[in-house]
């Protein structure tokens, strides 16, 4: 019930915020929207470098309200707000996209240590667990091997379910990013229409007409840039990260499952060997 109420709140927030952003794009004073035009009208432009003024011409508050505000608001309307917030947070994950590739070697080395202790009948200590850098591996080793909580088949299903759960969450984040990439150019067109209507309604100076025209042009530019240079690349990077992490989680699942069965370290390491990046590259070159 709490989740349902939270989703309703997020949807309501999206509608209200979207209306506020669109109305702000319409009603915000044009003289305070485009920074370069404001500097020129106030006589302050001469104190700035001409290249800086050219750059500032592309900064427009009305366009930002409509495109960015509209895109975010539509996302909260379309998706449960917790998932929407999580997708925004996932943007930071793209900067660790290469981590999973390096983590496979760490898992391989740590599996070797744990497998040797498990096979020889030695107790796995808290220090051993603390040395496991991957949180999935640490939790699975602690809960499923050290405490001997479940049987072999149940262990296999638990690990498989957790990997599937991660894949589902990653797919949801990618879906939301793809939605935002589609929505951004659409709101760019909304801003273009708003700018054209304001321009046609303008009966004052040429400067006022140019201010309205800048909104029409810049919203389209913002929508295209936000979609094609920000959101689509981030979604693509997130897909790559998902695939890398699925390989890593599958490697950990295989390792934990075999360690729990007290298989020989050599056998375990032979199975894990193909998960290492250089071995996958060799396989792709040979059979790709």
Where are these regions (language model features)?
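Large intracellular
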Residues: 1-10, 24, 28-173, 245-288
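Helix-termination/interfacial motifs at the ends of transmembrane alpha-helices
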Residues: 2-46, 166-240
